[in-house]
Amino acid sequence: MRHRFVVPSALVLVALLSAGPGQAYNGGPMRNVTDLTPTCAGCHSSVGKEQLRLEPDTLAASMLVENRHYEPIEEGTGPYKDMSPADRQKLLADVKLMDQSASATLSAPPTLKPGQEAQITATVRGGHGVVGVWVMESDLRLQGRPISADGWFIVGAPKVWGADGKEQTKWVDGRGAGLKKNLNAVLIFDQKADLAARKFPEGKVTWTVQAPHAPGTYTLAVAFHYGTEKASSVGTVTTVAGAILPKGGPGGPSGHILFSKPITVTVR
């Protein structure tokens, strides 16, 4: 017997509030040009249980992609209720392919001296449209923090490259005049997946950092936020205003969160 996990109403409210008017993560958190963690993306689906390992079982289950996103498509509930069985089957297959093809890795020197300057680089693959990359001190979705909370200092603006190999500054250029741009979070724009050809966009972000001054072993991970439905030929809906949204809606579960495997850096 299958057990359906229902997202508590309080979580739905958080998702809608964090989404902002009509956009959610559909076009990225464009107004939040600041340090970010995945807690701001309340409507997203989690890819993998490990990022929710400290949460109560019921809450964790409600956030997993299998229950939050796959199941409503498969059963034809919510925003998917008017889709034909054939279209739902295609959308589900396309979304699963997006997840199977998504990846995120993080690299950094294994050993640093206190305060030593170094570079850490995130490489991501997958998603469609705008994707988000946050560097964090753990791989916890709800309790992870920016690396600055663990003593790291980001030196200057992160360097961002999109699928075309060209450097992007759109995200950091959106920072308010006079504000520092040493952010832990970036958006990568114009990423396009071709499901028919099984081609998926890649992106790269490099942060120049100073190591913590306190000796010890530090954990680093990257949270990769990406959309899935808009890459599918049956995965969009057009509003009366002409906006193209995911089939699941702007505050729906089609945005997914994937963490890289954590790495450790020893400061000594």
Language model regions located:
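Bacterial N-terminal signal peptides that target proteins for export
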Residues: 1-9
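Bacterial N-terminal signal peptides
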Residues: 9-18
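Sequence context surrounding c-type heme c attachment/ligation sites in exported
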Residues: 20-268
